[in-house]
Amino acid sequence: MSSLLDKTRMLNRILQKSGTEPVDFEDICDLLSDVLACNVYIISRKGKILGSKFYSGFECDEVREVVLKENRFPDFYNNKLLNVNETLSNSPNHDKCVFDNLKDCSINNKLSTIVPINGNRERLGTLLLARFDKEFTDEDLVLAEYSATIIGLEILRSKQDQIEEEARKKAVVQLAIGTLSYSELEAVEHIFNELDGTEGLLVASKIADKVGITRSVIVNALRKFESAGVIESRSLGMKGTHIRILNDKLLEELKKIK
């Protein structure tokens, strides 16, 4: 069996391999499952399964169905996990199903270890390990807690990337709106009121007559938005123009103007 140092180095190699790219949670699950000989689940604070790996021979049909079909744990069970504020090791299931205490577990002597994933002074998720008959050792727990730290950092990085992407999309929309004349802005508001959701068919002449502007104003407004990359348009000839919104912040920013 590899030493703790060797196992830690394996985890570090996953980090080094990723470089500036996000770490793949499935890679962490695969490694932990192999070196700890257990089932591994990385669960978000809301119960979504971010990564998982079943160890060969340790497959529970009930859990497998949840993981593969639902891709999330039931709320009541996730709440139990979130109530664990520090590592809880070798918790027995008393031969009962974790999702239904009235139902017997198909596999006896199941032991679970729950490791909270924290970062920036908040709970980000849970690292859940499960195996049968053999208890998790202190060495196993050190590796699990180190892994939880790595996962926490990656979740925080992912959140920050998402925040930055949202800000970028909003800024692009605001710049695009800023290029419009008053009449073009008025035309745009009517155009997107006509759309059914994020895409639809636009007949420029109908909107021009309805608003009392020229068709060229509508065409110019659409061209500016298309140049900014916030929409995609395709002429269908006499039928009109098919428009699809590419930036999901567009409608939100237009509502603020009204």
Swiss-Prot record:
Location of the DNA-binding region in this protein: 204-223
**Which Pfam family is one of this chain's hits?**
CodY
Q: Where in the cell is it found?
A: Cytoplasm
Keyword hit for DNA-binding:
yes
GO MF entries: DNA binding; DNA-binding transcription factor activity; GTP binding
Q: List the disulfide bonds.
A: none
Which keywords does UniProt give here? Cytoplasm, DNA-binding, Repressor, Transcription, Transcription regulation
Q: Which residues lie within the region annotated GAF domain?
A: 1-156
Q: Please give the GO cellular component terms listed in this UniProt entry.
A: cytoplasm
Q: Which GO terms describe its biological process?
A: negative regulation of DNA-templated transcription; regulation of DNA-templated transcription
InterPro entries recorded: CodY (IPR014154), GAF-like_dom_sf (IPR029016), GTP_trans_reg_CodY_C (IPR013198), Transc_reg_CodY_N (IPR010312), WH-like_DNA-bd_sf (IPR036388), WH_DNA-bd_sf (IPR036390)
Q: Which HAMAP family match?
A: HTH_type_CodY
**What does the UniProt function comment say about this protein?**
DNA-binding global transcriptional regulator which is involved in the adaptive response to starvation and acts by directly or indirectly controlling the expression of numerous genes in response to nutrient availability. During rapid exponential growth, CodY is highly active and represses genes whose products allow adaptation to nutrient depletion.
Into which family does the record put it? Belongs to the CodY family.
Name listed for the protein in its UniProt record: Global transcriptional regulator CodY
Q: Which organism is it from?
A: Clostridium botulinum (strain Hall / ATCC 3502 / NCTC 13319 / Type A)
Ranked from the top, the taxonomy reads: Bacteria, Bacillati, Bacillota, Clostridia, Eubacteriales
Gene (UniProt): codY
